[in-house]
Amino acid sequence: MIVGIGVDIVELDRMARSMKQPRFLKRLLTDAEYELSQQYPLPRQIEFVSGRFAAKEAYAKAIGTGIAHGLSWRHIEILPDETGRPVMTAPFVGKIHVSISHSQTYAIAQVILEEEGHHVSS
């Protein structure tokens, strides 16, 4: 059974400006996400970081707390599986579905949370 849905959209230009702040990436990304982001050239890096930001915001909306009350950006990790599909690890007992997409202007993400034992087919 679905217990939460969250969606977020991010302007790539706004994220590019935020990324100029020295500690921004270290606050937003886990160590593994940060290492992966550093492998990309700058235009792709902005898309990557924007997608992660949108997905983490979408998760916070789906869980219902926002980034507060003991939940930080670094509690949520999104890494690609062997096929490149994003896989989210976060404090939730159940299945987390995440989808990330971007254009030249925006990144968007959707997160769906399912109760343990009540999964829809992926």
Swiss-Prot record:
Keyword Lipid metabolism: yes
Top EC class of this enzyme: transferase
Alphabetical UniProt keywords: Cytoplasm, Fatty acid biosynthesis, Fatty acid metabolism, Lipid biosynthesis, Lipid metabolism, Magnesium, Metal-binding, Transferase
Compartmental location: Cytoplasm
Cofactor(s) listed: Mg(2+)
BP-aspect Gene Ontology terms: fatty acid biosynthetic process
One Gene Ontology MF term: holo-[acyl-carrier-protein] synthase activity
Chloroplast recorded as keyword: no
GO cellular component: cytoplasm
E.C. numbers: 2.7.8.7
Gene3D superfamilies in UniProt: 4'-phosphopantetheinyl transferase domain
Residue sites binding Mg(2+) per the record: 8, 57
Reactions listed under catalytic activity: apo-[ACP] + CoA = holo-[ACP] + adenosine 3',5'-bisphosphate + H(+)
Disulfide bonds: none
Primary localization class, coarse: cytoplasm
Biological role stated in the UniProt entry: Transfers the 4'-phosphopantetheine moiety from coenzyme A to a Ser of acyl-carrier-protein.
Family: Belongs to the P-Pant transferase superfamily. AcpS family.
HAMAP family in alphabetical order: AcpS
Name of protein: Holo-[acyl-carrier-protein] synthase
Originating organism: Exiguobacterium sp. (strain ATCC BAA-1283 / AT1b)
